[in-house]
């Protein structure tokens, strides 16, 4: 999109209502540990336990659990109890677009 497209009316800016709705989600996702968790869950393609996520994130249970709670509170993740385990999965697939941008920036 360029300024000429906006001036000609062929494209429009994202509404403030939409931006206000998604800003808290972006703010909460934009944390290195949370991004790492999302990257791991995306690559696994199926729900994973806290212990699996701890191992992949190379972090302790308290830190991982705190980050999972934040993502769950924003409806980015779902949590489902199976026996003694709680399995986490990505609920809002649109956040994966942010990961794609990061992966693109990682390339030399």
Residue ranges and their predicted role:
Residues 73-80:
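Residue cluster at the C-terminal edge of the helix-turn-helix DNA-binding motif
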């Amino acid at each position: 999109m360029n300024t000429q497209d906006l001036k000609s009316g062929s494209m429009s800016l994202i509404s403030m209502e939409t931006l206000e709705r998604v800003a808290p989600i972006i703010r909460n996702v934009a944390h290195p540990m949370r991004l790492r968790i999302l990257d791991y869950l995306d690559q696994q393609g199926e729900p994973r336990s806290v212990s699996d996520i701890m191992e992949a994130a190379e972090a302790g249970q308290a830190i991982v659990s705190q980050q999972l709670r934040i993502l769950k509170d924003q409806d980015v993740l779902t949590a489902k109890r199976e026996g003694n385990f709680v399995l986490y999965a990505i609920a809002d697939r649109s956040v994966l677009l942010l990961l794609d941008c990061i992966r693109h920036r990682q390339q030399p």
